[in-house]
Amino acid sequence: MKRLLTAGLLAILTTIFCMAQVNEREILSDELCDKMCAAAHEKSKELGIDISFAIADRHGLPRVYRRYGDALVLSITLVPGKAYTAAVTQCKTKDVAGAAAEGAPLMGIQTNDPRITLVAGGYPLFVDGKIVGAIGVGGGTEAQDCEIAEYVVNVFEELTK
């Protein structure tokens, strides 16, 4: 009887987990990712800069990466790292940097996971208060990267209402 209850509970939990995965994939659909990429590119052209742009799922795993124009080669690794960091911490990378400063609660977090970056430009994406993914932007100044990221987050929020 105990085994039967355990097996039933496991089946229910597996179903719930799979449903959550499907919902996440539905939210970060190819179509939505394309629209977010277009928004990032549009804003970067408005600012007159070439950027790299990444989207990660809620686990920080890559969903999309785009390098526009002559964006810095460094951005090839840095920008996906921004998206990863924002996803796994559920915070803007700029905020993670503050929390990782000497004496702060997360001091040294970046030494535990080489994918963590403390460079501004990573923003989490939430739907109904739940993390569904994150974006990373790089190629401009800190202010430009954040301006583009905030623009894309606003587009995302409008499209997922």
Language-model segments: which ranges?
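Bacterial N-terminal signal peptides
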Residues: A7-I16
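Flexible, solvent-exposed loop/hinge segments and secondary-structure transition points
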Residues: Q21-K161
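Positively charged n-region of N-terminal signal peptides that target proteins for export
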Residues: M1-L4
